[in-house]
């Protein structure tokens, strides 16, 4: 009888241990999950854009377009004001010097100094490559579209250089005027964009933008390089590398006009 009672006690004790372990596991994973869900995904995206773009910026970059049998390098000066206004002018090579692009909101204009002509890009041209690169005109003109036209969900986390990274799934809002069927974004806890993947309406990966070589730049941690890579095409990509970058509190409104597009301030 004593052996039987001992057996019952041991069995009940093991059951109690298992129940406690199960309860602890549920609580542990609930805490982890609630920690992820407690973060507002839209706030993360907005903070990421605010950090990356700042109030205003002036930069000089080298843009290298790489193809299997050729390579082109442009030196570009850029001015940005918030998420809506940008001005780009080509400094080199000499034959392309003075070519420019102006972005105001979702509208874009290009300037060709050889014919002294400004052209406003129609919607049908917005999906075309910008300067023959892997960045489209849409990529430049709709920098704030990710904030306004998509709904965001945190789907996981990972670690990058000992810092937490939030993985965010962004899907278009109903009737949103967007090209992509989904975007998958990785934003670090210190507001740095790490990766942005673009999917078509069939949820097939089209291209991925990676932000690399994070270092002190422009007075704060910043990715020195951005690499836009086409899916399943290792030899087709575009690298944008910052040479000069400064962040400003403001830039004159006159910087972002058709007049400045033709005659940018150097």
Question: What is the role of each PLM region?
Answer:
Residues 4-23:
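Bacterial N-terminal signal peptides that target proteins for export
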Residues 22-32:
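Bacterial N-terminal signal peptides
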Residues 32-38:
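Sec/Tat signal peptide C-region and signal peptidase I cleavage site
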Residues 38-56, 62, 71-72, 105-107, ...:
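Flexible, processing/modification-adjacent segments and terminal tails
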Residues 59, 86-90, 108-112, 118-120, ...:
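Short hydrophobic/aromatic-rich beta-strand segments that constitute the beta-sheet cores
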Residues 61-95:
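N-terminal, post-signal-peptide region of Sec/Tat-exported proteins
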Residues 80-81, 102-104, 111, 154, ...:
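Generic beta-strand structural signal
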Residues 141, 163-256:
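Gly/Pro-enriched, hydrophobic low-complexity segments
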């Amino acid at each position: 009888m004593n052996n039987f009672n001992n057996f019952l006690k041991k069995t009940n004790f093991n059951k109690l241990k298992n129940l406690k372990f199960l309860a602890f596991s549920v609580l542990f994973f609930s805490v982890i999950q609630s920690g992820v869900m407690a973060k507002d995904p839209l706030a993360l995206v907005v903070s990421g854009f605010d950090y990356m773009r700042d109030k205003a910026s002036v930069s000089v970059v080298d843009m290298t377009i790489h193809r299997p049998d050729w390579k082109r390098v442009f030196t570009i000066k850029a001015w940005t004001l918030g998420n809506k206004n940008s001005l780009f002018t080509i400094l080199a090579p000499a034959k392309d010097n003075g070519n420019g692009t102006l972005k105001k909101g979702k509208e874009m204009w290009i300037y060709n100094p050889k014919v002294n002509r400004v052209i406003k890009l129609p919607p049908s041209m917005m999906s075309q490559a910008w300067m023959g690169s892997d960045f489209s005109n849409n990529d430049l003109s709709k920098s704030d579209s990710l904030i306004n036209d998509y709904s965001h969900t945190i789907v996981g986390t990972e670690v990058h250089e000992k810092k937490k990274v939030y993985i965010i799934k962004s899907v278009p809002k109903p009737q949103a005027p967007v090209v992509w069927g989904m975007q998958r974004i990785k934003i670090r806890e210190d507001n740095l964009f790490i990766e942005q993947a673009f999917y078509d309406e069939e949820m097939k990966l089209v291209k991925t933008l990676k932000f690399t070589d994070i270092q002190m730049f422009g007075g704060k941690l910043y990715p020195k390089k951005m690499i836009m890579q086409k899916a399943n095409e290792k030899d087709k990509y575009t690298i944008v590398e910052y040479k000069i970058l400064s962040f400003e509190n403001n830039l004159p409104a006159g910087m972002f006009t058709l007049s400045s597009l033709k005659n940018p301030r150097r």
